[in-house]
Amino acid sequence: MKVMAASFGLAGLGMTGCRCPEQVILPYSKQPENVIPGVPIYYTTSQPGDRDNVPVIVETQSGRPIKVEGNPSYSPYGGATSVYTQASILDLYDPDRASKSSISETAVRDRLSAINKTHLADGGKGLVFLAEPSTSPSRAKLVAQIKESFPEATWAEYAAIDQSTSEKAAKLISGKSLRSIPDFSKAKRILSLDADFLLNADASIGLARDFVKTRKVKDSKDSGKMSRLYSVESSLTSTGSMADHRLRLSSSQMGAFIAQIGAALGLSLPAAVKYAAASLDIDAKWVKECAADLAANKNHALIIAGEHLPQSVHAIVIAINEALSAPINYIEVSNAESGISEAVARLNEGDVKTLVILGGNPVYNAPVDFDWATAQAKAGESIYFGTDKNETAKAASLMVAASHYLETWGDGRTFDGTLVPVQPMIEPLFPTFNELEVLARIAGVGTTDAYSIVQATFTEQGGGDFNKFLSDGLLEGSNSKTVKLTSVDLSVIDASELTAPALSASKLEVRFTASSHTGDGRYANNGWMMECPDPMTKLTWDNAIMISPRLAKEL
């Protein structure tokens, strides 16, 4: 209880000097007529994510944000949020967050502007960016301007938990980078392939909401209407705990399994894929009956796969879903052409003058094969922009403190492409910076004011009334238009990814998964998240290696 009390104490209850933003929301130099002490005022904004900005409504008391809830105006989520969104407000008041940059505010602005002048001469040949993925159209516009000004620069994006494998697989077999948006409210039969879509997936808020609609049984007459969930997974998850039929299988064997499902459904598979399917010795009856059930519910059956699985697995899943006429919509998305591997390659060449890292913590969570810490040290200058004084910040030559999303202007898109604003609830508690300002100064554009940049982007996209956009918390009807998957070519996939290895106590498969407490590590200092029990193990304030009792005895 003492720890929880400490969490509440630092969540704004003991903070002083809290100020409202100077733009749009009135400052408290004089008591506004519509503000009554003890009566909350609500504002809309959204929590930025790699691929999904979550629309929220924030409760404020006397200028201080104190509670985050979902925005009911966004119908796919129905006013719901994730536990991460609920706890994100605590990070605003975290006394351990980066409260200032390693140099003065003026010096930071001068240094960012100097990057523009320095690299205009070499076309950006010595300039490398490593950024976390973002849905912001304003950031995308600034990135395009940076690429135009510095054609030789490298723009790479990296997320410790990559959720874009299915989109890359779609591009591989169809030529278009497509995001699948399943409609579980129309699905009667579901096969989940190592995918915890009820908890740890993009848009899991909406997916879970649609799924439970098909699981409600009021009396015996409704039993036939209830959906059926098949779950094949490597560890027990929230999704697996809800399954009607569950099969335990290692992640590395999922490729051979889905190839067997495809063959059982009569899908035309390349010879190499059929060969890979034969590499897995599994209960043939389970595969046969699962495939038959999916086929019997054509138009109302779908398969979803975990994003950690190889592209070849997702390619077969896409092909099967097309054959089943699954209730899935596709929207076209854009992914960065370069990733962390390209950034490391450029750094190892030894001629990078300036490295700009926007968020994340690659020194801590980049794959060990890349040895990011060594590569980062090879840059003439490394600039880290982020909210935490983490391992990457400490290894950088310059640290630029970032504002919390409740302190800043921005924009973004939800998982289905709906445009949403990011607006401040409070003036920055510390002398921190906005990502849009950082990029604008490097790009050398006319204005570096984030509010003006966001408003201009909104106008360019034909948004209409900007104030209504801020009030509603979204632009109605701005979701991405669905597209058809016109062709699927499985001959281009790497069938070797599908071959199932022989596993034993002496040849183990190890999976690193996202923590229910800390995500990819960014919530490690969030007391609320650490207090929240893991849905399966019930662990709090801890982590564990999960192995079976049998393996534990053998080891």
List each language-model region with its residue ranges.
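A cross-kingdom feature strongest in bacterial/archaeal respiratory oxidoreductases
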Residues: 43-44, 144, 153, 192-195, ...
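Short acidic (Asp/Glu) and glycine-rich catalytic loops that position anionic groups and cofactors
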Residues: 236-242, 268-269, 296-300, 326-329, ...
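Structural motif
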Residues: 130-134, 194-195, 305-309, 357-361
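Non-catalytic, well-ordered alpha-helical segments in soluble enzyme domains
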Residues: 433-459
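N-terminal export/assembly segments and adjacent metallocofactor-ligating motifs
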Residues: 1-282, 288, 533, 540-546, ...
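Active-site phosphate/pyrophosphate-binding segments
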Residues: 245-348, 460-462, 466
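Short, surface-exposed connector motifs at secondary-structure boundaries
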Residues: 119-128, 297-302, 351-354, 378
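A conserved amphipathic helix/loop scaffold
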Residues: 271, 422-435, 440
